[in-house]
Every structure is written in C-alpha cells, then in structure tokens.
C-alpha cells in the first residue's frame, strides 16, 4: 500500500548516486545534495510526503543552498489535503501522535454547523480541530473536515510554521460570515472561551 519512488531504472548506481535499498529514495543531506556533490534531489525521490507543494518547497530550499543561503523546509508544517466531499486537510501532529510522544495537550473543536456562512450555503458537514501544547499553548496540529478545508488549512500552516498559540488564532479577527470562523471558534474552544460552542 502506498507509493514508492521509481529510481531503480534511472541508472543512479552507475552515476554514483546512492539510494536507500529498501525504499528506493535517493539519499540526500540537509541541503538536498546527493552522494555526488553536484547533484541534488527533491520531491518524490527523497523521503517525506509525496506532495507537489512539498517538492516545490524543497526545490526552493535546494536552490537557496546552492546559492549559499540558509535553507530549510519545516516538514511539520506541510499541509496534507484530500479533495473529497467533504474536503479533508491537516497540518502538524494528530492527537494520536501527540499521545504517543507523551506531550501534554489540549484540544478544541467546532462544527461547521455552527458557522453562519456554512449554514447559509447548506455546507454544514464536518468540523475543525485545534491541538495545542498543554503548557505553552503552541499549536501542534490543525485538522479540518468540511467545506473549504483545502483553503482554510493555510492559516493552520502559518500557525505551525511560526509557532503561534491557539490564543493567537482565537484573538485574530476573522471576517463574518466566513468558513474560517470555525477555525477561530475551535481555537477559542482550546481556550475555553468559544462564543458559539454549546
């Protein structure tokens, strides 16, 4: 089950580019440099989620490394999106991962049925879940099932990338009526101050 990089027929061994014998991924360092210093690899050829936006971020980072600039991709801040109905989007850690890592945490959820825009448009299926560190309140993960999830996750990516707290999201003024208010309400639920949650 899943996908694997198709590297075995590329002649990489003959070129001297090392691959992982089990996964087929090209072995790279933190700069995306392969075992041949003038060859770089990104995207589906290297470990990590096989997503176009992850490959784009790695391509930019590799170019920055080649130019001698600092380069980094925060793999914890790469969104995953499933284009189904309803849409599914997530970034950061899941509640199961947080539990397995024994990290103290709090969660807040909010149903789209409580968002005025969702009700007006008849798109009330799903909810938003915010997972925050139990002591620092730093956002650890955001998960959305529902309308516009693919677009809404961008705010969650920013929160994870820049170490925002659930309070930061809760205190950010969101337009009304919007689907994004459900994210604000979920963050407010972490803070136990949701306005519309029952």
List each model region and its residues.
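Short beta-alpha connecting loops at secondary-structure transitions
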Residues: 43-47, 80, 168
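Short secondary-structure boundary/capping segments
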Residues: 30-32, 73, 80, 120
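Flexible, glycine-rich terminal cap/loop adjacent to redox cofactors
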Residues: 67, 83-94, 99-198
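FAD-site-proximal beta/loop scaffold in flavoenzymes
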Residues: 1-66, 159
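A short alpha-helix-loop-beta-strand transition element characteristic
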Residues: 4, 18-20, 69-79, 103-108
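Short, flexible turn/loop "capping" segments at secondary-structure junctions
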Residues: 34-38, 74-76, 134-136
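Rossmann-like dinucleotide-binding cores of NAD(P)H-dependent redox enzymes
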Residues: 48-56, 64-97
């Amino acid at each position: 089950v899943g996908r694997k990089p198709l590297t075995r027929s590329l002649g990489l061994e003959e070129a001297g580019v090392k691959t992982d014998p089990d996964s087929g991924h090209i072995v790279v360092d933190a700069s995306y440099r392969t075992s041949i210093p003038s060859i770089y690899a990104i995207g589906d050829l290297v470990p990590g989620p096989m997503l176009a936006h992850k490959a784009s971020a790695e391509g930019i980072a590799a170019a920055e490394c080649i130019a001698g600039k600092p380069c980094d991709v925060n793999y914890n801040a790469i969104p995953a999106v499933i284009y189904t109905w309803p849409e599914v989007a997530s970034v950061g850690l899941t509640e199961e991962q947080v539990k397995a890592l024994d990290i103290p945490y709090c969660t807040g959820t909010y149903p789209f049925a409580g968002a005025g825009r969702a009700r007006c448009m008849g798109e009330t299926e799903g909810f938003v879940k915010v997972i925050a560190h139990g002591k620092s309140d730093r956002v650890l993960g955001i998960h959305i099932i529902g309308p516009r999830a693919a677009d809404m996750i961008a705010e969650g990516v920013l929160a994870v990338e820049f170490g925002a707290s659930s309070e930061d999201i809760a205190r950010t003024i969101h337009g009304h009526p919007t689907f994004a208010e459900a994210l604000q309400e979920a963050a407010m639920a972490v803070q136990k101050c949701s306005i519309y949650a029952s």
